[in-house]
Amino acid sequence: TKTIGDRWVATGKDFDVAFDLKQGTISRLVYSGDTLIREGNEPRLTAFRAPCDNDVWIRSQWVANGLHNLHHKVLSHKITELPGGRVELYFTVRSQAPNAASLSMKKASGRYQITEDTSRPFGDEDFHFISEVVWTVYSDGKITLRSNISSNKPHLTLARLGYEFVLPQQYEDYTYYGRG
């Protein structure tokens, strides 16, 4: 294992993983020569989904609070080597939209449009998540993620909350063993 610039890299038998120390997530993951995660498709916290008719009471608030456009920044990190070849990467991550936005519906098409208001940058008082994230990398290449996520507006109803990432197309059939 080693740190190279803003990346922490580990290589083992049949696996290679890199973490982005500025975003607090995996930036590359290769098992047995197959790239599963590449830069741009890394796991990231998301709290937005496309609104539907039943969301009329809350959908504008999702956009106004920036849930559709979260950017992630590491506030602190620590890397700890543990017995048995395990390594834990601890991150405190702030997830927040860069600016205000609004949602409108085009009546003729029935489509929603999000308009970004770059003249109103978000600050500390605006909606954001703080995540305490722990990635554990095992010597056999297994990787686990634990996170504790909170926000400065705990009463805001969220559409969803979880981590998403994009797998290569050849992995279209898979089994998910998590909650939700």
PLM ranges: what are they?
Residues 1-180:
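Beta-strand/loop-rich accessory regions of lumenal/periplasmic or secreted enzymes
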